Swiss-Prot record:
Glycans are attached at residues 32, 112. Expressed mainly in lymphoid tissues including spleen, epigonal organ and circulating lymphocytes. Residues 1-71 form the Ig-like domain. Residues 76-133 are annotated as: Secretory tail. GO terms for biological process: adaptive immune response. The keyword Transmembrane does not apply. Keywords: Adaptive immunity, Glycoprotein, Immunity, Immunoglobulin, Secreted. One of its GO terms (cellular component) is immunoglobulin complex. It comes from the Eukaryota. This is IgW chain C region, secreted form 2. It is found in: Secreted.
Length: 133
């Protein structure tokens, strides 16, 4: 989830070990505070995910010169630590009072993974860390 940006001009790209991938970016929605929000995701087969390759989501917003990225990779068992996004504070101002608002990256709080063999894994995410339920 990428939220809190204005104007509605955010670019999202996905990479697997620095090679461009075809991710999905949904149409932006305007929020009550007049900023925008969108969702992007990359579908990765389990056999590829478990090889340990690094997947990166890169977000840029020309209106605010915001650039950030989140990298992740499979880690067997235990805890998966996610980095805190770049430290830029999101702007939640109405469009009339600022020229550009910073987007912020929001982590999914619960993650359900369906394996190709029909099995399922559930993760509970809190404070930038995910643990298997």
């Amino acid at each position: 989830v990428i939220s809190g940006f204005y104007p509605d001009s955010v670019q999202v790209s996905w990479k697997k070990d620095r090679v461009d991938q075809s991710g999905v970016v949904l149409h932006s929605k305007q929020r009550n505070d007049s900023t925008f929000e969108t969702v992007s995701y990359l579908t990765v087969p389990v056999v590829e995910w478990t090889t340990g390759d690094v997947y990166t989501c890169e977000v840029s917003h020309t209106g605010s010169r915001f650039n950030d990225r989140i990298s992740m990779r499979y880690q067997k068992g235990g805890t998966v630590n996610l980095p805190v996004p770049g430290g830029n504070t999101p702007c939640t101002c109405p469009p009339s009072s600022c020229s550009g608002c910073m987007p912020k990256l929001v982590y999914q709080t619960d993650l359900n993974v369906t394996l190709e063999n029909g099995g399922q894994l559930q993760y509970n995410c809190h404070q930038q860390a995910c643990k298997i339920k």
